[in-house]
Amino acid sequence: MNERIKIGVIGVGHLGQTHARLLKQVKTADLVGVYDVDRTKAENIAAELGVKAFGSVDELAQSTEAVSIVAPTSVHYELAARLMKEGRHCFIEKPVTASVKEAEEICAIADRENVKVQVGHIERFNPAVLALSHLKLEPMFVECHRLAQFKPRGIDVAVVLDLMVHDIDLILNFIKSSVTSIDASGVGVISDTVDIANARIKFANGAVANLTSSRISQHPMRKMRMFQRDGYISIDFAEGIAEVYRATKPELGVPSGLNLGTIGIGDAARVVTYEQPEAPQVNSLKMELELFLQSVLADTPTVVSAHEALKVMVVADSIVKQIEESKKLLSL
């Protein structure tokens, strides 16, 4: 078995260049080249890394076993479908596609062609999220704020697909229950699509998630707060820090962390503790690329599969459609 996978990058804008530079550092990757419709961009990064600037997608495909697709969302499906049918494993940046129908087709092709697909939901690999891996997470109420300053990149899709998908993916991963209802609102301020959105998602087990995403905010914020029966968990994605507060019955023993004292009396007494679990010092993007290549080499499932990404798209699509319907009603 080869110990390195021949891989190429399609789309070398800001993020695509980062993919290429990191793949050059990954031991299991043999970065053979890049392709971009902007020939100058491709040649510049290729020269920097000492790889080839391919003249077409077909030329790149013929020289690779796997491809990292970092092109605009609108062409994800076209590129991935074409490459998978040629037997190429695909890492696809989020969102997986521009529509649910396209995402369904990606899943079908991947299964039929027996190729690996991993989708770039990078917050799964945020140090703060990794720091919580030892905890049993059963959140019943989740509050998310993902606010960013305006940048012209990514405005071809609504903020729901650009930013909110990160939180949708995490919530579906944390709350092991089916979605029962979604209530959403949003508005376009600068772009022709939705720039700020809020969604309230209810689950069959009674859990509720409230998500707000904006790409027109003055002060950036990427935070999630989760409340469950025995405690409260706060995640600061930007700082890579997780904080855990627990309220435990004294007879069950005091969990690790700083003891903040006891609240309540009698049967209602609870010991309150605080912990800031150690977060691993990792490059999240490099880690997800390494895991993708590991799944190709070992023929194991990818950590964020096309089927998981499809579930995210179904929720995101419902949110976008609700917002569009409310806009139609307002225009009557």
Regions found by a protein language model. Give the residues of each.
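C-terminal helix-rich "cap/oligomerization" subdomain common to oxidoreductases
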Residues: 1, 66-69, 291-332
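A contiguous active-site-proximal alpha/beta segment in oxidoreductase catalytic domains
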Residues: 97-154
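A short helix->loop->beta-strand "cap" motif at the edges of active sites that frequently abuts
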Residues: 51, 86-88, 113-116, 207
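Mid-domain beta-loop-alpha active-site segment that forms a flexible
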Residues: 120-127, 150-181, 194-195
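Contiguous beta-strand/loop segments that form the cofactor/metal-binding neighborhood of enzyme cores
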Residues: 168-247, 279-300
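Hydrophobic residues in well-ordered beta-strands that form the structural core
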Residues: 55, 92, 117-119, 143, ...
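N-terminal Rossmann-like dinucleotide-binding module
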Residues: 1-49, 171
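Beta-loop-alpha module in the N-terminal Rossmann-like domain of NAD(P)-dependent dehydrogenases
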Residues: 19, 49-107
